[in-house]
Amino acid sequence: GPNPAINGYVRSNGAAVRVIAGATSGGAALVVRQDAGISKPEDFHGKRIASPQMGNTQDVALRAWLKTHGMKTTDRGGDVQVIPAANPDQLTLFVKKQQKQSGHCLTSSSADGAWAPEPWASRLVHEASGRMFLDERELWPKRQFVTAQLVVRTCFVNQHPDLVKAWLRAHVELTDWINGHLTEAKAILNSQLQKETGRL
């Protein structure tokens, strides 16, 4: 995502990496549990929301969105708890309800929502009965934002400029072909995924 690329750039004073192409736009959403009692932004007070990793793209988006709506996370003196949880773990957190034992809730047992990239956002909806609260595209001009890009080490670009140009040319041509042949591209991708994973 963009944040690791920015971190690499900033930590090296601009010397370590170069972003040479975009790879994906969009594909992230805030999904909430059906029974979480969340229908508007202010309903997030006192809730537990998962993000894939502290400081990653979705985590930053979640924290910025909360701040925009006047909320603070618990680590900043507020009442919204952000839970760093890998995407597969979000499914588990999402379906668990807080269990009560001896009159108190067990900790780390559930999440009321998650800001997740695809395909995990859709999986939360379809496999965990979640509800799409916000498609992140709604927050961006022209509904476009970077979720992945191609980053190359600066020394590699300097040592192999022709190879980088050839790879970039192929990337652009393939992207154009996919965008012009979506049905065929999906069939090819699904066939290859089935071959690699042995699953439909």
Where are these regions (language model features)?
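Pocket-lining segment of extracytoplasmic ligand-binding domains
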Residues: 2-4, 36, 89-194
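Short, glycine-/small- and polar/acidic-enriched structural segments
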Residues: 1-85, 91, 99-118, 133, ...
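Acidic/histidine-enriched active-site and ligand-binding environments that engage anionic O-linkages
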Residues: 194-200
